[in-house]
């Protein structure tokens, strides 16, 4: 495996490059920054954190489904929209409460399939879709879902709080398979019973309550290295990752695996004295977890193995989202 070529393919991976417009979008809302008084966390994290004046805070997130995936299977788009939203709340250590959707459909068949997929997600995870809006007569299909959750104020797992010296932990549900509509989808939920899924998603709440993580994100479209890159970018730190320590399933190409968006997967950081306990909590919940690297001073995210070491991102000149904590 040529590390230089791997690094370049990660940088140019569509799951990474599609994040770049975020910087321009966020800059528009900086013009109204004084109105964000109740937002403890906003752009750049898996969910916004909203102050409601008590021990609990509201988590608020939204995801839209990529058009090409939606066209391949409206049902899967509906189901997947639930999964990714649940993951956003879980990654912050929270309990998901309810969702709303905005759907557009070019036929009654597509609309029904979208809604049936959403309903299956509700059945699996026990988080209801409580309303929304539908355009039943568009020339295209689209779906966006928003979710709210709740978490104790002092238990929020943010992505901009990693610090040099922290250990990097990757955790995956390995009981999965490549999904039907993308080589970068790792389905770990569609074939499992609701009770199993609901129990497994409590793991991040336990980690949050025990304060085992210093920062974290769910592994999303940019894959493991890209997701860790977003965490480093917002935390204003670098990282080094030992590729040989990354958990991986049998029968999946390793480069493909690094780009996978798993049904259940996390990139967390932890204090060295608590990293092993954090790994153990993931493992007890049925995930495969390992310390794969370390947060470093500086701006470079490096990967290495026995053959050498290369920089994937140098945030002094590169960007993924362009969002950095103040």
Language-model-derived ranges and their functions:
Residues 1-5, 9, 13, 285-326:
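Acidic, Ser/Thr/Pro-rich beta/coil linker or hinge segments at domain junctions
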Residues 1-37:
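N-terminal amphipathic/basic leader segments beginning at the initiator methionine
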Residues 39-42, 135, 219, 237-249, ...:
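Beta-strand->loop->alpha-helix junctions that form or flank phosphate-binding loops
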Residues 73-100, 113-124, 199-208, 224-230:
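Small-aliphatic-rich amphipathic alpha-helix that forms the alpha element of a beta-alpha
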Residues 180-196:
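Short, compositionally biased
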């Amino acid at each position: 495996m040529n590390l230089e070529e791997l690094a370049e393919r990660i940088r140019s991976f569509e799951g990474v490059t599609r994040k770049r417009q975020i910087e321009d979008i966020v800059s528009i809302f900086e013009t109204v920054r004084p109105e964000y008084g109740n937002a403890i966390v906003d752009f750049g994290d898996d969910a916004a954190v909203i102050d409601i004046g008590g021990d609990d805070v509201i988590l608020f997130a939204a995801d839209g489904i990529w058009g090409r995936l939606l066209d391949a299977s409206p049902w899967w788009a509906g189901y997947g929209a639930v999964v990714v939203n649940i993951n956003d709340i879980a990654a912050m250590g929270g309990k998901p409460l309810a969702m709303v959707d905005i759907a557009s459909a070019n036929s009654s068949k597509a609309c029904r399939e979208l809604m049936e997929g959403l309903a299956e997600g509700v059945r699996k995870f026990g988080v209801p879709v409580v309303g929304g809006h539908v355009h039943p007569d568009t020339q295209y299909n689209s779906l966006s879902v928003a979710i709210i959750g709740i978490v104790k104020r002092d238990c929020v797992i943010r992505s901009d709080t990693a610090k040099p010296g922290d250990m990097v932990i990757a955790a995956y549900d390995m009981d999965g398979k490549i999904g039907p509509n993308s080589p970068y989808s790792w389905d770990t939920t569609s074939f499992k019973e609701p009770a199993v899924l609901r129990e497994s998603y409590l793991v991040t709440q336990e980690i949050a309550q025990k304060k085992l993580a210093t920062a974290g994100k769910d592994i999303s479209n940019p894959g493991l290295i890209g997701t860790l890159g977003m965490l480093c970018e917002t935390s204003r730190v670098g990282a080094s990752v030992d590729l040989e320590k990354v958990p991986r399933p049998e029968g999946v190409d390793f480069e493909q695996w690094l780009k996978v968006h798993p049904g259940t997967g996390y990139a967390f950081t932890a204090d060295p004295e608590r990293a092993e306990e954090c790994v153990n909590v993931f493992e007890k919940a049925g995930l495969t977890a390992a310390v794969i690297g370390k947060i470093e001073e500086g701006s470079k995210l490096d990967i290495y193995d026995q053959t050498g070491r290369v920089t994937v991102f140098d945030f002094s000149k590169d960007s993924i989202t362009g969002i950095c904590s103040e």
